[in-house]
Curated annotation (Swiss-Prot):
Modified residues annotated as Phosphoserine in this record: 34
DNA repair listed as a keyword: no
CDD domains to which the protein is assigned, alphabetical: ACT_AHAS
Family that this chain belongs to: Belongs to the acetolactate synthase small subunit family.
Keyword Phosphoprotein in record: yes
Protein name: Probable acetolactate synthase small subunit
């Protein structure tokens, strides 16, 4: 009886197609005595101790190779011949690639300052520093790595005003002379049109380069009909960014002086904090106990 009744209700449910208000009652009557199937629980496999240790070893990442750290040395040396060769020989013997080396005189007579920027491991750099200090002509070696300092580098860059399409014209002088002789045989009207197009090209190129130089607080050192020389004094990273932005315009020549560094003066708040730490408190003002 119950199965026959369920069959009738099922046929009625099919005819209604879940549009009637009594469709939920029909559904509950059909599925009242049918329990929902239980989800099968799959237990994870239990690994043994050797398998667990092997899994941990295989999943542990390897130690990444540390990049060579950037070191900045400031050497105070005697102003005499042969000091630079002895110092560079020590660095070359240990395989250092010197990023920058600047030598200049100081305000003191017979005293020069060398600013060296190199990359290498801390232990190897420390050994090279001690060997440099052992040179007779070296007064002191100051390590500015990790300290608050001011770094500046001067850049002179010659950029083309003809655009990237005419970049090779600066290196092909013979073809340029031949083209200029052939251009004289052309009509005056065609020559005026080419001159106007070249003038507009130079003006747009000059405006874009000048705007970029202004954003980096640089200045124009020299300008001609085909090239412009830019001057920028900034940090080494800022100079690298400026050069990368100038490359699409066509950099003909670039000259960098190298890094000059000088430590910053301590701030007033740092001095006061150190002074407060050194103040001794009298026992009278201490709490009891």
């Amino acid at each position: 009886m119950f199965a026959r009744r369920c069959g009738r209700l099922a046929n009625r449910f099919v005819r209604l197609k879940s549009t009637s208000a009594t469709s939920p009652i029909t559904y509950k009557a059909l599925h009242a005595n049918s329990p929902l199937p239980r989800c099968r629980i799959i237990e994870p496999p239990r690994a043994t101790v050797p398998e667990a240790v092997s899994n941990i070893i295989m999943s542990t990442p390897f130690n990444r190779v540390q990049r060579p750290k950037r070191h900045v040395f400031n050497c105070l040396v005697q102003n005499e011949p042969g000091v630079l060769s002895r110092l560079s020989g020590i660095l070359a013997a240990r395989g250092f690639n010197i990023d920058s080396l600047v030598v200049c005189a100081t305000e003191v007579e017979n005293l020069s300052r060398m600013t060296i920027v190199l990359r290498g491991a801390d232990e190897v750099v420390e050994q090279a520093k001690r060997q440099i200090e052992d040179i007779v002509s070296v007064w002191a070696v100051l390590d500015y790595t990790g300290t608050s300092m001011v770094e500046r580098e001067l850049l002179l860059a010659k950029v083309s005003l003809l655009g990237p399409d005419h970049f090779q014209e600066h290196f092909e002088r013979s073809e340029k002379v031949a083209e200029s002789t052939n251009a004289k045989a052309k009509s005056d009207g065609e020559g005026v049109m080419n001159a106007n197009a070249a003038l507009q090209l130079r003006a747009s190129q000059l405006a874009a380069i000048n705007q970029l130089t202004t954003l980096f607080h640089g200045r124009v050192a020299d300008i001609s009909t085909e090239t412009i020389i830019l001057e920028l004094t900034a940090t080494p990273d800022r100079v690298d960014n400026f050069l990368s932005l100038l490359r699409p315009y066509g950099v003909l020549e670039a000259c960098r002086t190298g890094t000059s560094a000088m430590t910053r003066a301590p701030h007033s708040n740092e001095v006061t904090e150190e002074a407060e730490d050194d103040v001794e408190v009298e026992e009278v003002f201490l709490p009891p106990g």
